[in-house]
Amino acid sequence: MRQGLLVLALVLVLVLVLAAGSQVQEWYPRESHALNWNKFSGFWYILATATDAQGFLPARDKRKLGASVVKVNKVGQLRVLLAFRRGQGCGRAQPRHPGTSGHLWASLSVKGVKAFHVLSTDYSYGLVYLRLGRATQNYKNLLLFHRQNVSSFQSLKEFMDACDILGLSKAAVILPKDASRTHTILP
């Protein structure tokens, strides 16, 4: 009788652990097969970010809104430009997307871009997961894109919930407005 209860308890613990792990996997970056890349294309403000990579953002006193331009070059090829204002101008990254699956692979200009996932969007905002790294190093980056330079409460809440799931809550930053030159990265 005791062995039966012990086995039952172990099975119950195993089922609970597997269920908890699968819930994270269901949300954790998934493919965006239903994403309309033409609607997602265009200019975006980067209103918030969370990262575990050092040096991804300027110093705290120099942080301003970032910007991004997403463009479909041709069928199956996506080009993404990210810019954050720095003391000497904008820091830019131009990774390219060779397939249609939602993954963004690095071009020669940016080494170490492993993935670009759109986790959630209604085409007025986008929650984007960017994975950077080389060899055994991996860095998680979560970006909140918005068409306007202000965000809704709901999209900020979704951003913070995603930060919790990815373990980036302490690194979450809401970027202050800067209307001076963010629009200058437009092609």
Swiss-Prot record:
Domain of life of the organism encoding this protein: Eukaryota
Listed Gene3D superfamilies: 2.40.128.20
Subcellular location: Secreted
GO biological process, one term: response to lipopolysaccharide
Signal peptide feature range: 1-19
Keyword Glycoprotein: yes
Residues with attached carbohydrate: 149
GO terms for cellular component: extracellular region
MF GO annotations: small molecule binding
The entry's keywords: Acetylation, Disulfide bond, Glycoprotein, Secreted, Signal, Transport
Disulfide bonds: 90-163
Main location: secreted
Modification N6-acetyllysine occurs at: 170
Role according to the record: May play a role in male fertility. May act as a retinoid carrier protein within the epididymis.
Family the entry assigns: Belongs to the calycin superfamily. Lipocalin family.
Protein name per the record: Epididymal-specific lipocalin-10
